[in-house]
C-alpha cells in the first residue's frame, strides 16, 4: 500500500469519526484573558475578576479604564504586576492581588499614589519595597509570603492596618516601624519573632497580634498606651507582666503559653476578656479571685485545659463564679446561668 492510499484511508476514518466540538460555557482554563474585560464599559469604576486563572495583566487591556477605582484579581496565576502602570494614577485607590504567584513588587506600584488599600497576601514576595510614595495608604496586607524583614515603610504616614502574618520575620528591627505613628493594628502571627522590642513608634496602636511566635516575655509595651487588644497565644510566655501602662486594654489573649498564675492585671480596669486556656495555671480559686477582684468590667474568662480546671471539673464553674467579679458573663465559651 502506497503513501497516498494510507492518507486516503486515514482521511476516510477521520471523516467517519468526526466529532462536533461544543464550546464549554464554564471552562476550566481561560485561554483568552482579553475576553474578560472586552465587554466592560470604559468608564467602569470597579473590576472584580476572581479565580479565573488569569496569567497576564497586559491581556486585560486595563489602560482603557480611565475611571477605575478598585481592581480585584484574587486567586489567579499572575506573576508580574508591572502593568499596573497603565492604571489611572489619580483614581485607583484599591488593588487586590490576594493569592497569585507574584514574586516582586514592581516599581510601577509606586506610581499609584492615591492607593489606600493594597493586598498582596498569599504570594511569593520576599522583600517589602517600592511603596515609599504611597503616602495615602491605610491598609497593607502581606499575609503568607516569604518576607524576612520589616522594612521600607517609614514614609507610609497614613497607614492604619498592617498584616504580616505567616511570613519569615525573625526580629523587629530598630527602624521596622519608624514613622508609623498612625498605625492602629498590626498582625504578626506565625513568624519567628523572639522578643517584643522596637515598638515605641506605634503611639496609636490599638491592636497588637503576635501569636505563634517565639516570645518568652511580655515586655517593652509601656509606650503603647492606646493598646486595647493584645494577642499573644501560642508562645512560650511564663508570666503575665509588663502591662503597667496599658490601661486601655480590653482583651488579653495568652492562650497556650506556660503561665502558672493570672497576676498583675488588677490595674487594668477596662479589661473585659481574659483568654488563658491551655497554660499551667494551678493557683487557688481564692488567689485567682484576689488577683482579679478590681476588674469590674470583666465579662469573659477562658481557663479550660489548665490544672485549675482539669483538677476541679465538677466545682470549677461554680467556684469561678463565686470568686470572680459579678460582671462575669461567660466561662469557657458558655454563658453563666442567671
Swiss-Prot record:
Official protein name in the record: Protein phosphatase 1 regulatory subunit SDS22
Report keywords, A-Z.
Cell cycle, Cell division, Leucine-rich repeat, Mitosis, Nucleus, Phosphoprotein, Repeat
Q: How does it assemble?
A: Interacts with YPI1.
The answer, when asked if Nucleus is one of the entry's keywords, is yes
User: What GO cellular-component annotations does this UniProt entry give?
Assistant: cytoplasm; nucleus; protein phosphatase type 1 complex
Q: Where, per UniProt, does this protein localize?
A: Nucleus
- What Pfam families is this protein classified in? LRR_4, LRR_9
InterPro entries xref list: Cilia_flagella_integrity, Leu-rich_rpt, Leu-rich_rpt_4, Leu-rich_rpt_typical-subtyp, LRR_dom_sf
The role this protein plays is: Regulator of the mitotic function of yeast type 1 protein phosphatase.
UniProt keyword Transmembrane helix present:
no
The record's family statement is: Belongs to the SDS22 family.
Annotated GO molecular function terms are: protein phosphatase activator activity; protein serine/threonine phosphatase inhibitor activity
Further information: Present with 3870 molecules/cell in log phase SD medium.
- Gene name, please? SDS22
Where on the chain is Phosphoserine found, per UniProt? 56
- Gene3D superfamilies from the UniProt entry: Ribonuclease Inhibitor
GO biological process assignments: cell division; chromosome organization; chromosome segregation; maintenance of protein location in nucleus
Q: Where in this chain does the record put each LRRCT domain? A: 306-338
Q: Where are the LRR repeats?
A: 43-64, 67-88, 91-113, 114-135, 136-157, 158-179, 182-203, 204-225, 226-247, 248-269, 270-292
Amino acid at each position: 500500500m502506497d503513501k497516498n492510499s494510507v492518507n486516503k484511508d486515514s482521511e476516510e476514518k477521520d471523516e467517519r469519526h468526526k466529532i462536533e466540538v461544543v464550546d464549554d460555557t464554564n471552562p476550566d482554563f481561560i485561554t483568552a484573558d482579553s475576553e474578560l474585560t472586552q465587554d466592560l464599559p470604559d468608564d467602569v469604576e470597579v473590576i472584580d475578576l476572581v479565580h479565573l486563572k488569569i496569567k497576564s495583566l497586559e491581556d486585560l487591556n486595563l489602560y482603557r479604564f480611565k475611571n477605575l477605582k478598585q481592581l480585584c484579581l484574587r486567586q489567579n496565576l499572575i506573576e508580574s504586576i508591572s502593568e499596573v502602570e497603565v492604571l489611572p494614577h489619580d483614581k485607583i485607590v484599591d488593588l487586590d492581588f490576594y493569592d497569585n504567584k507574584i514574586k516582586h513588587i514592581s516599581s510601577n506600584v509606586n506610581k499609584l499614589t492615591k492607593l489606600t488599600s493594597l493586598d498582596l497576601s498569599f504570594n511569593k514576595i520576599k522583600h517589602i519595597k517600592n511603596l515609599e510614595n504611597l503616602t495615602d495608604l491605610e491598609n497593607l496586607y502581606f499575609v503568607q509570603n516569604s518576607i524576612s524583614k520589616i522594612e521600607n515603610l517609614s514614609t507610609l504616614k497614613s497607614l492604619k492596618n498592617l498584616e504580616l502574618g505567616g511570613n519569615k520575620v525573625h526580629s523587629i528591627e530598630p527602624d521596622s516601624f519608624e514613622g508609623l505613628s498612625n498605625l492602629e493594628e498590626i498582625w504578626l502571627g506565625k513568624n519567628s519573632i523572639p522578643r517584643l522590642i522596637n515598638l515605641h513608634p506605634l503611639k496609636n496602636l490599638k491592636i497588637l497580634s503576635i501569636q505563634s511566635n517565639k516570645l518568652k516575655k511580655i515586655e517593652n509595651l509601656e509606650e503603647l498606651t492606646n493598646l486595647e487588644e493584645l494577642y499573644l497565644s501560642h508562645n512560650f510566655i511564663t508570666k503575665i507582666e509588663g502591662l503597667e501602662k496599658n490601661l486601655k486594654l480590653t482583651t488579653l489573649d495568652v492562650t497556650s503559653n506556660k503561665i502558672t498564675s493570672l497576676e498583675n492585671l488588677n490595674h487594668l480596669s477596662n479589661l473585659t476578656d481574659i483568654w488563658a486556656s491551655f497554660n499551667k495555671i494551678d493557683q487557688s480559686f481564692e488567689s485567682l479571685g484576689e488577683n482579679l477582684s478590681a476588674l469590674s468590667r470583666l465579662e469573659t474568662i477562658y481557663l479550660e485545659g489548665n490544672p485549675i480546671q482539669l483538677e476541679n471539673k465538677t466545682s470549677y464553674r461554680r467556684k469561678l463564679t463565686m470568686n470572680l467579679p459579678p460582671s462575669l458573663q461567660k466561662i469557657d465559651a458558655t454563658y453563666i446561668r442567671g
